[in-house]
Amino acid sequence: MNANPKFLSADAHVDAAAVAPLPNSRKVYVTGSQPDIRVPMREITQADTPTGFGGEKNPPIYVYDTSGPYTDPDAKIDIRAGLPALRQRWIEARGDTEVLDGLSSGYGRERAADPATADLRFPGLHRNPRRAQAGKNVTQMHYARQGIITPEMEYIAIRENQRRAEYLENLKASGPNGAKLAAMMGRQHPGQAFGAAAFGANALAEITPEFVRDEVARGRAIIPANINHPESEPMIIGRNFLVKINANIGNSAVTSSIGEEVDKMTWAIRWGGDTVMDLSTGKHIHETREWIIRNSPVPIGTVPIYQALEKVNGKAEDLTWEIFRDTLIEQAEQGVDYFTIHAGVRLQYVPLTANRMTGIVSRGGSIMAKWCLAHHKESFLYEHFEEICEIMKAYDVSFSLGDGLRPGSIYDANDEAQLGELKTLGELTQIAWKHDVQVMIEGPGHVPMQLIKENMDLQLDWCKEAPFYTLGPLTTDIAPGYDHITSGIGAAMIGWFGTAMLCYVTPKEHLGLPNKDDVKEGIITYKLAAHAADLAKGHPGAQVRDNALSKARFEFRWEDQFNIGLDPDKAREFHDETLPKDSAKVAHFCSMCGPHFCSMKITQDVREFAAQQGVSETEALQKGMEVKAVEFVKTGAEIYHRQ
């Protein structure tokens, strides 16, 4: 499908729904050690506790915000100009890059000179790409191993802490019961972190820039931050940090336009997508990607073999190292932050898939398997891996080593092909680390619950704790249309066991290309799974939001319940289906139980009765039961009464 002309006209814009602030929320910025380290967070305002429940102040809570400038009313959003180059000064100040005279990729130059693409191109880029100076390495891992704390690392430390300390201090200062309130709202259940370094007996009270540097230096975390994507807001992927989620977007040969993909990106980050992968396989892949990157505040990943295949008209056997290499450079100079590269699909593993129920289900894996069989040679990705590393470190592109032999059904889970490839990915990780190139490892797939932990344990062992990035896994194969749920179950589990980033699955998985509604559904499901994993691991401060929402629920602060939740719009919509009037927003019940059977209202009544009688809640319950017993006998001791 050709690009939508309306999107590319002078009035091109993102839809208003993607840029409006979320209810009762505002963008706030926390400044670091220098003025241009301004870390965004979402502040959610809360109402005071009603007088009947104590009348105390409830200070705002702060949550991680991936939406970039889009939800900041003070920001001027023009997708034809792109986002501000947030990291440009930091990159320049390091003095180890050079601005190129033009594009290095032959295909990139061809597209730039093609008059047929003139009306499709992103018009707002007025700078040439950068590359490392000769002999220099510009990866965040390289800096970390030199003992350097970069502005990106400081930014991340501030971001991961989510102003938790300030929130608790505000609680303490909120009134006479402030200290008690802070202790209650800061309380968190101990987690089980399966050996993760940041948790347990010596858990960090807060994430520090030095801790970020150390985790990146060890290879346990990555900061995907291509020097040609200065618009990105630094983030980190590692099991000692908040579990992140990725959203896949991208056109296909039969549907979607450039405009729709940009809208999907802004929609995905609004609801919490930490990274976005552009998996476009249709027309104008190069131009689509440029629009997305220039307007994205989150890291962008791709699978370069998809575009390379388009360059040879879809014939896998016609792929060459030279075409693939040019594609890597083309995308690196556009600013792609991480590449999925299926270098672990080796010739010797392909026959191991013959007895599978569903064979090879990875598109990238099947492309490389077909090439290996057609030439009866080892994959050129494997053979040229060191050369790929040289490209990656010249732009600071991170590896996402692809699981091309992942199981496509629970029948095939943890088989010889899958685990053989995983072991190879561990070997390739060591090669990449020799070049100080950042690496994460992709994982399955379809795995029943009882086999999930084995996947995590083997990955940690064979890949030396490089971050794991998994698609789900889907825990059953019986629910087309609901695979965001079948996979969300597995995602929560594997996130708890140590996976650093979860790739979302939408309700359209296995059925079709997701639209914006599907993207939101997938994002919310996976934010839920990631948060559940953070709670289970005992991540510092993970329970703050739960505690705030629970307190609002108990105090019947309906608007706060909606707004603190992951999807305020849906929560409000569901409530208003049965109780649409404004008066219902202050009622001490909902339509589930009604006014007489609300457990929380009954508890409040017990507390009020106890206060009036000057006794404890336990004594109040006992006294109340005694009163009711006498009343029961006086009315005839009948269980049922005729009306």
From Swiss-Prot:
Q: Where does [4Fe-4S] cluster bind?
A: C590, C593, C598
For activity, the cofactor(s) needed are:
[4Fe-4S] cluster
Positions contributing to Zn(2+) binding: H446, H510
One GO MF term attached to the UniProt entry: 4 iron, 4 sulfur cluster binding
Q: Name one GO biological process term.
A: thiamine biosynthetic process
Residue sites binding substrate per the record: N248, M277, Y306, H342, S362, R363, G364, D403, G404, L405, R406, E442, Y469
The record ties this protein, via InterPro entries, to: ThiC (IPR037509), ThiC-associated_dom (IPR025747), ThiC/Bza_core_dom (IPR038521), ThiC/BzaA/B (IPR002817)
**EC numbers, comma separated:** 4.1.99.17
- Entry keyword set: 4Fe-4S, Iron, Iron-sulfur, Lyase, Metal-binding, S-adenosyl-L-methionine, Thiamine biosynthesis, Zinc
According to its UniProt record, in which pathway does this protein act? Cofactor biosynthesis; thiamine diphosphate biosynthesis
Instruction: Give the reaction(s) catalysed.
Output: 5-amino-1-(5-phospho-beta-D-ribosyl)imidazole + S-adenosyl-L-methionine = 4-amino-2-methyl-5-(phosphooxymethyl)pyrimidine + CO + 5'-deoxyadenosine + formate + L-methionine + 3 H(+)
Which GO CC terms are listed, alphabetically? cytosol
Q: Can you quote the record's cofactor note?
A: Binds 1 [4Fe-4S] cluster per subunit. The cluster is coordinated with 3 cysteines and an exchangeable S-adenosyl-L-methionine.
Organism domain of life: Bacteria
- HAMAP family per the UniProt record, alphabetical: ThiC
- Describe its assembly: Homodimer.
What does this protein do, in the record's words? Catalyzes the synthesis of the hydroxymethylpyrimidine phosphate (HMP-P) moiety of thiamine from aminoimidazole ribotide (AIR) in a radical S-adenosyl-L-methionine (SAM)-dependent reaction.
Please name the NCBIfam families in this protein's record. Answer: PRK09284.1, PRK13352.1, thiC
Q: Which family does it belong to?
A: Belongs to the ThiC family.
- Name the UniProt record assigns to this protein: Phosphomethylpyrimidine synthase
Q: Which organism does this record belong to?
A: Burkholderia vietnamiensis (strain G4 / LMG 22486) (Burkholderia cepacia (strain R1808))
Q: Which gene encodes it?
A: thiC
